Curated annotation (Swiss-Prot):
Protein name in the entry: Glycine cleavage system H protein
Family the entry assigns: Belongs to the GcvH family.
Highest taxon of source: Bacteria
Purpose: The glycine cleavage system catalyzes the degradation of glycine. The H protein shuttles the methylamine group of glycine from the P protein to the T protein.
PANTHER family given in the database record: GLYCINE CLEAVAGE SYSTEM H PROTEIN (PTHR11715), GLYCINE CLEAVAGE SYSTEM H PROTEIN-RELATED (PTHR11715:SF3)
Keywords (A to Z) from UniProt: Lipoyl
Quaternary state and interactors: The glycine cleavage system is composed of four proteins: P, T, L and H.
PTM-bearing positions, type N6-lipoyllysine: 58
Pfam family, one: GCV_H
Native species: Methylorubrum extorquens (strain PA1) (Methylobacterium extorquens)
Cofactor info, note text: Binds 1 lipoyl cofactor covalently.
Cofactor: (R)-lipoate
Length: 120
């Protein structure tokens, strides 16, 4: 299940763990990424709080926790090669994995069609 937030993050659910990243729209707006800071594994995140930072030559932007949960994994490759987040944001450029407190909360997020309309 793929869902999107109004802060331009995407989540892909596998069981009760969501892979989180920024959308292609956000990556395009930011331009060439030069720095990525991710949360620590084991960190408890609350929906809406700043969880990560992506920085481009144009701007730095917080990436917000789309839902509440615990960070189970981070994409070290994205830290080592921030450009990968911009070139493949919904693939190899994922940021972190979050064990959701309540997986049913995904239902409150946008599907792909709703996000496409929102991001226009």
């Amino acid at each position: 299940m793929l869902r999107f937030t109004d802060e331009h993050e995407w989540l892909r659910l596998d069981g009760d763990v969501a892979t989180v990243g920024i959308t292609a729209h956000a990556a395009e707006q930011l331009g060439d990424l030069v720095f990525v800071e991710l949360p620590k594994v084991g960190a408890k995140l609350t929906k809406g709080e700043a969880a990560a930072v992506v920085e481009s030559v144009k701007a730095a932007s917080d990436v917000y926790a789309p839902l509440s949960g615990e960070v189970t994994e981070v994409n070290e490759a994205a830290v080592a090669d921030p450009a990968s987040v911009g070139t493949d944001p919904q693939g190899d450029g994922w940021l972190y994995r979050l064990k959701l407190d309540d997986a049913s909360a995904m239902d409150g997020l946008m599907d792909e069609a709703a996000y496409a309309a929102f991001a226009k």
